[in-house]
Curated annotation (Swiss-Prot):
GO terms for molecular function: ABC-type vitamin B12 transporter activity; catalytic activity. PROSITE patterns: GATASE_COBBQ. The active site is at C334 (nucleophile), H445. SUPFAM superfamilies: Class I glutamine amidotransferase-like, P-loop containing nucleoside triphosphate hydrolases. The gene is cobQ. Pathway: Cofactor biosynthesis; adenosylcobalamin biosynthesis. Belongs to the CobB/CobQ family. CobQ subfamily. This is Cobyric acid synthase. HAMAP family: CobQ.
């Protein structure tokens, strides 16, 4: 039977996902077969497994940290918000419908508990250690009766719980004490320790507070993890984009503007771009903030028609088309690709009651939404022309697709040709081009994770500014692995690994054996 440890938080966004990834890497480096698990995840950042299932991006990264192939059992329930108080429900990698919050939490989630149990039982048979991540807070009284993500999961797994608090936002001690007070006595016993996360400052000054916390709660503080703003791992949800609107995420010589759609999804598509030196990437949700960037990207969306209407109301459609008319490059990914076309049809009301809407008319495609959903890992080759794709013709790219509907090319050549979809050999066109190749779009998420393509995009933007190509550009996959080791090393140095091993009943001590420099 697998050993388990569960991370629960005093609230959302306290850093559970990142700490879970760190623990997965620590256990992996100690020679254990380890798997992540999150029973229910609400996020718009998702990915495709090798067998074509959809799961939360955070658990995919945690699986990478654990050195294993991601499986939908690691995240059996995924909720993807489509509008206010409504979400698409994904169960074991497949969509089962859209539900409102009241309907889902009222009774539907209880029907899914057996799927959670089955998924965990599978992982328990396959792995030695399971790192479980909770959702939100275990003390949400209004949802507690029907919750399937926190203490109920801990009981099922027999997992000791570590309660994580974010001290950077303030009130961490009160959050810990308050959370424990609101738990039932039998739940409180399950909490084996406390982790204070995102600390910056003098630890000696914090020590009296830690002593108080241990005395007041009777729970040991297993570690104080430093604030790690540059951990470089994909973030789970768009809450991390709050406060960055209209501002740059860094300084650089070329400027890229990503439109921050209300239902933006898979903004992890831009993680590699943000990591490149000399790139200034910023998120924009007002026409007045768009300015004159070197490149505009329309990202994926969980509500393409709704976000297109928003784009129009904000004046961003006009601003983007004016930039395109002046020669500014435009890229669309998935929902953003659909928006760049001539029109979008939704005859079966997959997204909204709007059956047809005009697009930005910057790409020669028409899109028709369908009830079936494509979720696949894909490989293909570049077929497009123009400055961005022309020099790469014939080169292989890879990524994944997650979309409902199909786009039909009306003129010109496709940007890519898919040669493998979900492990099956295929020959399928993907994407479109216009404006002599300056404007292009694709359904392939992660397209900019491909080093050669991303480097070509940046080199073209630099050349348009009269700047030389930058040597030594990023190897994104190697960088992700390096940053996982750095993260795990930082957590290992500030966490009592001996006490953690004892809490879990491990037979051998935990040490850090990674390469974190």
């Amino acid at each position: 039977m697998a050993k388990a440890i569960m991370l629960q938080g005093t609230s959302s966004n306290v850093g559970k996902s990142v700490l879970a990834a760190a623990l997965c890497r620590i256990f992996h480096r100690n020679g254990y077969r380890v798997s992540p698990f999150k029973s229910q995840n609400m996020a718009l950042n998702s990915g495709a497994t090798p067998d074509g299932g959809e799961m939360g991006r955070a658990q995919i990264v945690q699986a990478m940290a654990a050195g294993v192939v991601p499986r939908v059992e690691m995240n059996p329930i995924l909720l993807k918000p489509t509008a206010h108080a409504s979400s698409q429900v994904i169960v074991l990698g497949r969509p089962v419908g859209n539900l409102g919050a009241r309907e889902y939490h009222g009774h539907f989630n209880q029907k899914l508990w057996s799927r959670v149990e089955e998924a965990y039982a599978f992982l328990e048979r396959e792995f030695e250690i399971i790192v479980i991540e909770g959702a939100g807070s275990p003390a949400e009284i209004n949802l507690k009766a029907g919750e399937i993500a926190n203490m109920r999961v801990a009981r099922m797994a027999g997992a000791p719980v570590l309660l994580v608090a974010d001290i950077d936002r303030g009130g961490a001690l009160a959050a810990v004490v308050g959370t424990l007070e609101l738990l039932e006595p039998e739940e409180r016993v399950m909490v084996a320790g406390i982790i204070i996360n995102k600390f910056r400052g003098d630890l000696d000054l914090l020590k009296p507070a830690l002593d108080f916390l241990e005395s007041r709660t009777g729970k040991p503080v297993l570690g104080v993890i430093p604030f790690l703003p540059d951990h470089g791992l994909p973030e789970e949800d768009s809450v991390v984009l709050e406060g960055v609107t209209g501002r740059s995420t860094g300084a650089g010589e070329v400027e890229i503007a990503v439109i921050k759609l209300p239902c933006i999804s898979n903004f992890t598509d831009f993680d590699a771009l943000e990591r490149e030196k000399g790139v200034n990437l910023r998120y924009v949700e007002a026409a007045s903030d768009l300015g004159n960037p070197d490149l505009v990207i329309l990202p994926g969306s969980k509500n393409t028609i709704g976000d297109l209407l928003w784009l129009r109301c904000q004046g961003l459609e006009t601003a983007i088309k004016e930039l395109a008319g002046r020669g500014t490059p435009i890229i669309g990914i998935c929902g953003g690709y659909q928006m760049l076309g001539k029109e979008i049809r939704d005859p079966e009301h997959v997204e909204t009651d709007v059956e047809m809407i005009k697009g930005l008319d910057l790409l020669p495609i028409k899109t028709v939404f369908q009830t079936s959903k494509a979720t696949n890992q894909v490989r293909g080759v570049v077929t497009g022309s123009g400055p961005f794709l022309g020099p790469l013709q014939g080169q292989e790219v890879q990524g994944y697709e997650i979309h409902m509907g199909a786009s039909f090319l009306l003129d010109g050549r496709p940007a890519f040709k898919i040669t493998s979809r979900g492990g099956r050999l295929v020959t399928l066109d993907d994407g479109a081009l216009a404006g002599e190749g300056r404007i292009w779009g694709t359904y392939i998420h992660g397209i900019l994770d491909n080093d050669s393509l991303r480097h070509q995009v940046i080199s073209v933007l630099r050349a348009r500014r009269g700047l030389p190509a930058r040597p030594g550009m990023l190897n994104f996959m190697a960088e992700q692995e390096r940053r996982l080791d750095i993260l795990a090393g930082e957590v290992a140095r500030h966490l009592d690994l001996g006490r953690l091993a004892a809490i879990m009943g491990l037979e051998r001590p935990l040490v850090w054996t990674g390469h974190d420099n």
